[in-house]
Amino acid sequence: MSEKPIVRMAELEIDPDTIETYRALLIEEIEASVALEDGVLSLNAVSIKDHPNIIRILEVYADRDAYEAHLQTPHFLKYKKETSDMVTSLTLIDVDPIAMRSKP
């Protein structure tokens, strides 16, 4: 494993007609990823107030290997396949963390 954590922000726009189904699939994928993958340190999804179809996901992986492994998991591949027609826009942004803290 490499040493540097991978942190990225995913910015998505979802077809408003599919938002409830999309959210259910996103929750399922996040819960599986955090529970089953040691290298997935954190996945946090939020929507923009008054624009529930605009989603932001802060993703934190232990390292590049963990991120690459995540992309090949059955639960992630299922999520990508089942949501592909729901996502109207996707931007992935690599970010440098400044301060990230949480309580257990």
Where in the sequence are the language-model features?
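Glycine-rich beta-strand-turn "strand-cap" elements at beta-sheet edges
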Residues: M1-I6, N44-N53, K80-P104
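N-terminal first-folded block
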Residues: S2, I6-L36, L41, A45
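An amphipathic, aromatic/His-enriched active-site/gating alpha helix that lines ligand/cofactor pockets
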Residues: E28-L41, V60-I93
